[in-house]
Amino acid sequence: MSDRGDDVACAWAPSPCQTGRQACLRLLATLIDHAGGDARGLAVFLLDHGDAPSDVRPPARPALDQATVIEVSRRLRAVAPAWNRLLRGDHGEFVVIAQGLVDGGTVLGTAARLVHAFDEALQGAETCVDAEVSVGIAFAPQHDARAEALLAAAEASLREASIRARRGRRKRRPAAPPSDSAA
């Protein structure tokens, strides 16, 4: 990880850029501490394309080239207000940590705009990425207001969203044509 902060995917981070789960946890803990332990209005959005990671396997997703990572980052930053943070997770997912969200409707609206921005960036990529964008969400006070619990809730939500997306793709696949050997 560079100390120069030149990783454009997380250039929105407040200090020398860091990625990964530990950086997300540190940032969440800092934001909660600065709010006097009151995490109300704090939301974590994990955005990914392809299958979500699990504890035993890396995610199954098409790789994003650097130009696409830059474009996804640019579009995600355009959706969220300037006081929010954008980082990259351990498995390449994008993490948006947002403050000042007032209710579940605002959180869901923000999530929809983030997914749309991510999807637009993938569709506009020079190397078109055919993948479903999934989002995992955790929002305080609906989830435990500790940093670890918020991030874990967002990770679980992302896994569930990826499973639903994968099931939906299977249902939409056209039936295989009948084989000639059956005749």
What are these regions (language model features)?
Residues 49-52, 101, 140:
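Hydrophobic pocket-lining residues within nucleotide cofactor-binding pockets
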Residues 9-29, 36-44, 50-77, 87-91, ...:
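Conserved long alpha-helical elements within nucleotide-processing catalytic cores of c-di-GMP signaling
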Residues 1-14, 22, 156-183:
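C-di-GMP signaling machinery
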Residues 39-41, 85-86, 128-136, 168:
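Residues at or immediately flanking beta-strands
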Residues 48-50, 83, 89-96, 134:
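Short acidic-rich active-site patches of cyclic nucleotide enzymes
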Residues 93-99, 123-157:
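A short glycine-enriched loop-to-beta-strand structural element that forms part of the catalytic core
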Residues 34, 78-83, 115-128:
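Short catalytic/binding micro-motifs of nucleotide second-messenger systems
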Residues 24-25, 104, 108-109, 115, ...:
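Catalytic-core segments of nucleotide cyclases and related cyclic-nucleotide turnover enzymes
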